[in-house]
Amino acid sequence: METLAPFAAVLAGYLFGSLSFAVIVSRLMGLADPRSYGSGNPGATNVLRSGNRIAAVLTLALDALKGYVPVLLVLLFGPRAGLGTDTAAFVGLAAFVGHLWPVFFRFQGGKGVATAAGVLLALNPVLGAATLLTWVIVAAFFRYSSLASIVAAAFAPFYQALIWGVEPLLLAIGAMSLLLVWRHEGNLRKLLAGTESRLGQKAAAPAGTAPPHPRRGRGHQHGKHAGKGHS
C-alpha cells in the first residue's frame, strides 16, 4: 500500500486542482461563464472583467488554496504513509497541472498563477514570500500583471537553487515555472507588440461584442473572444 501512496496522493492533487473555481464561483453568483468573455481564461483576472470584485477575490483565494491545501495535507499527514517533502512538491505540481487542464471542465483551465503561489507558500513559506515579493516589485514598476507573473515564475527555481540548493523538489518547482511561462505565450507576444493591458486598465473588447453580464437561463450563450489573457 505504501508503494501506491505517492501515486494516490498525486492523483488526488490533480483532481483537486481540476476544480475550476472561476467557473464554479461565477455559476453560484449568477455570473457569465468566464470562458465565454474577455480572454476566455477561467481565472481571477478574467472574472474581475465581469465587474464583480467579490467573485474575483473569491476565485483568487480558492485558486491559491487549491495549491496550498493538498501540499499542506501531505506535509502534515504524509509521513504516516512514508510520504515526504518531495512527494508534497509533486502533489503541488499535480494540483497546478489540474488547474491548467481540469478533467472536470473539458481541460479548459487557467494559467495557474494563484495556484502556483499556493504551492510555493505551502512547500516553503520563505520561497513563496520571495516569489510574491518579486511579483509585487515588477508589477509596481511596470504595471503589467502578466510580466510580473512571468518574471516571478522565472525567479522561483533560481531562488530555490541559490538559497536551499538543488534539492529534488527543484524539479517540481522548475516544471511548474516552465509551464506557467509557456501558458503566458500570448501575453509575451502582446508585451513585445506593446498591446498588453496594464494593471487597472480594461482589456479592449473585440468589435461587435457585448460586455459580460449575468447568465439568463440555460439556453443563453456568450460569444467567445479571440486571444488569450493573463489569469
Predicted feature residues:
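Helix-coil boundary and interhelical linker segments in multi-pass alpha-helical membrane proteins
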Residues: 1-9, 69-90, 121-127, 160-172
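Helix-loop-helix "hairpin" substructures at the membrane interface of multi-pass membrane proteins
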Residues: 50-52, 56-59, 82-98
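Interfacial segments of multi-pass membrane proteins
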Residues: 48-52, 74-78, 112-142, 154-164
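Interhelical loop and helix-boundary elements at the membrane-water interface
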Residues: 12, 16, 21-68, 100-114, ...
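Anionic-ligand binding patches
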Residues: 68-72, 88-123, 129-132
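Alpha-helical transmembrane segments of multi-pass membrane proteins
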Residues: 13-16, 95-99, 135-139, 156, ...
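Short, hydrophobic/aliphatic alpha-helical segments
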Residues: 2-9, 26, 92-103
